[in-house]
Amino acid sequence: MKPTDRRLCIVCRLQRIAFFLLLLLAIPALVWAREPQHAPVPELPGKVEGGLTAEEVASRAEHTSPDLESKEREVDAAAAQVDAVLVGFFPRLQGDVSYTRLSYVAPSELPLGVQAPGAPVGPLSAGTQLVKTQPAVIESLRNNTQLTVGLSYPVTDVLLRVSREHAAASKSAQAARLNAGAARLKIRTDAKLTFYGWVRARLQREVAERAVVQAEQHLDDVRVAFQADRVAKADVLRVESQLADAELQRARARNLVAYTESQLRVVLHGSPAEVLEVGEDVHLALPLVPGFPPLTALAEEAADNRLEVQSLLASASALRSQAAGARAPVVPSITLVASASDSNPSSRVFAQTDRFTTSWQAGVRASWSPNDVVSALASGRSYEAKARSADAQLKSLKDSLAIEVAQAVQDVENADAAIGSTARGLAAAEEGYRVRRLLFQAGRATSVELTDAETELTRARQAADDARVDQRVSRARLHHSLGRDVVSSQLP
């Protein structure tokens, strides 16, 4: 064979090898070209015009809460008690009307002795003729009618007991109003937290929906690769298991949405047919808090603003006023009394006649009982002990508020810190998933690596959503913990 022919044969062989290699490279491309088209990954929905916001939910919960209605009725009861005690400052006016039918009693005879008919008034002269007279007959009247109007004014009771009972009732009414106001603010805060819990569940559902779509795309990719003998059957089964798990998480997320929506409907007390949509853009992060004052200053602010603290102060003051009023019987009771009566017959007329007679009387009455003194001192000690118990509760409440404020501040700081880190993590996870899928389609990445990228992307999406919701939840709690929502509230 000539050298020229030998060189031509080698060239032909190289051309055939190149053609065969190009054909091998084209087959996967043709296979990938037949990959089924999927629906795009769903985007998270934004706010809906006319949808619910946290403030709207709080307002509706406030106006429909049965717990708040109960507290307001307690306020009415306390106000009525103040009116009842106020009457004690005025003199006591009392009217009595009585009628009595008496049994028959034989008339009484009153002997009148002897008389000297015609004799002048004065000493009788000797020899004056005396005549024995008939005895006077006194009839017993069987009908007894009496109309009496009495007026009394307990001087010492008004000074020592009624005035302090009125102060105690006024403080109790103030405590009831403060309790109702505190309940109102707590209901509003809890309603906001319920709303954000529902929003969080909806975001979790959307993330789960996107995870299912990604798992379906991964399964189709790995099936195509399996047909091209680029992956093993075990890789296909692994992705099928991943898809099944994603579908399970989606079902749980949907159930969580249904549960939190039922909670929200209970809070709103609305119609079951009402369609609930989110009217607040929770995809936007809130501005970061630049910094906080010292925790001691925040705890003092909470103690000054929170209505629960003011309510306990009013309750303790009411108990001490009750203790002072309970000790009033230690001092003798002095009462001014007066009365007027119209009686038939009158006990002040002798002899009794069948006619009405008007009379009056006025005086001062003093009374004192050692038994009442012992009871009053014991009652006073009881109220003082209750007042000291209220003082201890107040100290415990302030300690709890300090812890609550510290926790709320930490939650705000953690949520703000998570905003930046989760945003960076989500961007990295999205880009990592995109690149990893392209590498897998090109045969330069394994199915396990793509699965890890999908898992990381789902986790990053969930973390980013949680961070934005946590911002709103933590601020609502901090606002309530510091008592800054008291300014915008209207006490009953």
Regions found by a protein language model. Give the residues of each.
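A glycine-/polar-enriched beta->alpha junction
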Residues: 59-69, 76-92, 135-141, 150-167, ...
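Acidic, low-complexity, intrinsically disordered peripheral segments
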Residues: 32-35, 101-103, 461-492
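Bacterial N-terminal signal peptides
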Residues: 17-29
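Amphipathic alpha-helical coiled-coil segments
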Residues: 70-85, 183, 187-206, 217-219, ...
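Small/polar, glycine/serine/threonine/aspartate-rich low-complexity segments that form flexible
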Residues: 39-50, 96-151, 281-292, 324, ...
